[in-house]
Design a protein with these regions (language model features):
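Activation segment signature within eukaryotic-like protein kinase domains
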Residues: 121-122
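Protein kinase glycine-rich loop
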Residues: 15-21, 26
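Protein kinase catalytic-loop region centered on the HRD/HxD motif
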Residues: 126-139
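Conserved activation segment of eukaryotic-like protein kinases, specifically the C-terminal portion
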Residues: 175-188
């Protein structure tokens, strides 16, 4: 794991850990020369089965994000691939996931979430999905759920975690792998019902 206070690639000073998933840890880092904060996603090779396959997926994820430019999507600024770790340097998104917002609402005896806000979030999601689906090579996100949507302090959303995204390939009959979150995944994500497509993200 990266240590707090260490400097990555000679320019990113690690400030603190801000998140952790199954295979990755996310840190807040500062580029002192540019005086700008970034998020660094670290995936360590040790303890990961078949890292070659995982690495291939990470490269695909970063290549997809680097090809996109939309205000509701994070930007990747650097990829550092060495013998021990795979690091992705990207925009630091301040705020909470919609999943956290919903949980906090329930925990505080129904703290209201206003209809106007829900409509705004829905419009923004439609905007970013339309952008993804109308690329020259359409991008299918495949894991649209509240946990993957960040709500920033200004009310704008940001769709994060493109680990399951794929390029839609005309002529394919099935996805090569079945990915998605139970409870959100569309029938075709379980195999045997055709490849995932724009309608898959709408179903999610």
């Amino acid at each position: 794991m990266l240590s707090i206070g260490s400097v990555v690639d000679g320019k990113y000073k690690v400030l603190n850990k801000i998140g952790q998933g199954g295979m990755s840890v996310v840190y807040l880092a500062l580029n002192e020369r540019a005086n700008k904060t970034w998020a660094i996603k670290e995936i360590r090779k040790d303890g990961v089965q078949d890292f070659a396959t995982v690495r291939q997926g990470l490269i695909a994820e970063t290549n997809i994000l680097k090809s996109l430019n939309h205000k509701y999507l994070p930007s990747i600024v650097d990829v550092i691939d060495d013998k021990d770790t795979f690091l992705i340097v990207m925009d630091y998104i301040q705020g909470k996931s919609l999943n956290t917002v919903l949980k906090e609402s329930l925990e505080h005896e129904g703290l209201p979430i206003f209809v106007e806000d829900v409509i705004s979030w829905g419009k923004q999601l439609c905007d970013v999905l339309y952008y993804l689906h109308t690329r020259p090579q359409p991008i299918i996100y495949r894991d649209m759920k509240p946990a993957n949507v960040m709500l920033k302090p200004d009310g704008e959303i940001c769709v994060v975690d493109f680990g399951t995204a794929r390029v839609f390939k005309t002529g394919n009959t099935e996805d090569t792998t079945c990915l998605g979150t139970p409870g959100y995944a569309a029938p075709e994500q379980y195999g045997g019902n055709g490849q995932t497509r724009p309608q898959t993200d709408i179903y999610n």
